[in-house]
Amino acid sequence: MQNKLIVKKLGRQDYEPVWKAMHKFTDERTDEDVDQIWLVEHNPVFTQGQAGKAEHVLNAGDIPVIQSDRGGQVTYHGPGQLVAYFLINIRRKKFGVRDLVTHIENLVINTLKAYNIDSTARPDAPGVYVDGKKICSLGLRIRRGCSFHGLALNVDMDLSPFQRINPCGYQGMEMAQVSQLGGPSELENVEQQLIQELVELLGYDQVDIQATSNITAEA
């Protein structure tokens, strides 16, 4: 059972309830509980990471700003962006934190490669980039040997809210998205490719994919 993965496709959700459910799952899970990946599309929100500074939120306007406990600084989530939360027992997987970050970056790079999009990671700024533009943000937290939070991949979204912040603390950071680079505009398409790459890269033997809008965090 321990090398099984549950993938929950949660659809469109507000950020805060999902964040609280991640906490609950991580706080209550045992060494026997199966790892989970949650795939979700959030309603518009800015989230500040633990290193976030108020001055990097330039003009939030009508979009709420939520203080999160993930790594990194401020980013934007909104419709048309694929967010994946990695609820993984990294102690059981024998991953270090840097190993997990590298695996996630490679997962995104391989997913984009399937659409003939060449992308790279950067040693100075976690995430994935295409020609210097950021296409995927990444922020994690580890508690009790288990990860939570994850990645946000821009698929087919309104990128203009990123101009209201310094994304991940970088002034003038330009953003890219899959649909503008010849890839698909449907999140479902990208989800399927991401799951396929993830199972291969992280070495799970069995995958249970569940489509549900219920975010109760039972293993």
UniProtKB/Swiss-Prot annotation:
The GO terms this record gives for MF are:
lipoyl(octanoyl) transferase activity
Q: Which GO terms describe its biological process?
A: protein modification process
Instruction: Please name the pathway.
Output: Protein modification; protein lipoylation via endogenous pathway; protein N(6)-(lipoyl)lysine from octanoyl-[acyl-carrier-protein]: step 1/2
Which terms are listed as keywords in the entry?
Acyltransferase, Cytoplasm, Transferase
Assigned EC number: 2.3.1.181
Question: Which enzyme type, at the first EC level?
Answer: transferase
> Per the annotation, which location comes first and is thus the protein's main one?
cytoplasm
> What reactions does this protein catalyze?
octanoyl-[ACP] + L-lysyl-[protein] = N(6)-octanoyl-L-lysyl-[protein] + holo-[ACP] + H(+)
Domain BPL/LPL catalytic positions: 31-206
Site (Lowers pKa of active site Cys) at K134
* CDD domains given in the database record: LipB (cd16444)
Residues at the active site = C168 (acyl-thioester intermediate)
**Does this entry carry the keyword Cytoplasm?**
yes
Does this UniProt record's set of keywords contain Thylakoid? no
Where is it located?
Answer: Cytoplasm
Q: Which residues bind substrate?
A: R70, G71, G72, Q73, V74, T75, Y76, H77, S137, L138, G139, G150, L151, A152
A cellular component term from Gene Ontology for this protein is: cytoplasm
Briefly state the protein's biological role. Catalyzes the transfer of endogenously produced octanoic acid from octanoyl-acyl-carrier-protein onto the lipoyl domains of lipoate-dependent enzymes. Lipoyl-ACP can also act as a substrate although octanoyl-ACP is likely to be the physiological substrate.
Extra facts: In the reaction, the free carboxyl group of octanoic acid is attached via an amide linkage to the epsilon-amino group of a specific lysine residue of lipoyl domains of lipoate-dependent enzymes.
The record ties this protein, via PANTHER family, to:
LIPOYLTRANSFERASE 2, MITOCHONDRIAL-RELATED (PTHR10993:SF7), OCTANOYLTRANSFERASE (PTHR10993)
Q: Which family does it belong to?
A: Belongs to the LipB family.
NCBIfam families attached here?
lipB, PRK14342.1
- What name does this protein carry? Octanoyltransferase
**What organism is recorded for this protein?**
Vibrio atlanticus (strain LGP32)
Q: Which gene encodes it?
A: lipB
